């Protein structure tokens, strides 16, 4: 008889050491963002300080300063690194296509 026990897959949480400048991260609960077109509200890390992360993304309006938040808040927001999934030099169009 086949074992049909349900096994939950647990997503690995990001750690502070995994955050890298220039990489893009997706939200745990993605939302649409952008001024003229809808994109996923991904964030690209521009700078990492001792306790803060400065980022860019479709939700950051043109000619505005890059927002800075604590590393803990960024990690609470971020689900995973999506840099390799994105078209080169572009943001992910909303809605996100199902794989």
Question: Which residue ranges define each predicted feature?
Answer:
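Mixed-charge, Lys/Arg-rich low-complexity intrinsically disordered regions
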Residues: 2-20
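Intrinsically disordered, low-complexity, charged/polar segments
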Residues: 4, 59-99
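Short, charged low-complexity linear motifs
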Residues: 9-13, 41-42, 76-79
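Short coil-to-beta transition motif at edge beta-strands of beta-rich domains
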Residues: 14-35
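Generic alpha-helical hydrophobic packing signal
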Residues: 16, 21, 45-49, 65-72
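A structural detector for beta-sheet-dominated domains
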Residues: 17, 28, 56, 94-97
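Basic/aromatic-rich interaction segments and small domains that mediate binding to polyanionic partners
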Residues: 37-66
């Amino acid at each position: 008889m086949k074992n049909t026990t349900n096994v939950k897959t647990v997503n690995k949480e990001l750690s502070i050491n995994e955050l890298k400048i220039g990489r893009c991260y997706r939200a745990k609960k993605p939302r649409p963002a952008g001024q003229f077109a809808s994109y996923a509200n991904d964030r690209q890390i521009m700078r990492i300080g001792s306790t803060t992360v400065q980022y860019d993304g479709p939700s950051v309006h043109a000619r505005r300063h890059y927002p800075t938040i604590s590393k803990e808040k960024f990690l609470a927001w971020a689900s995973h690194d999506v840099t390799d999934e994105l078209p080169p030099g572009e943001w992910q169009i909303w809605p996100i296509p199902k794989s």
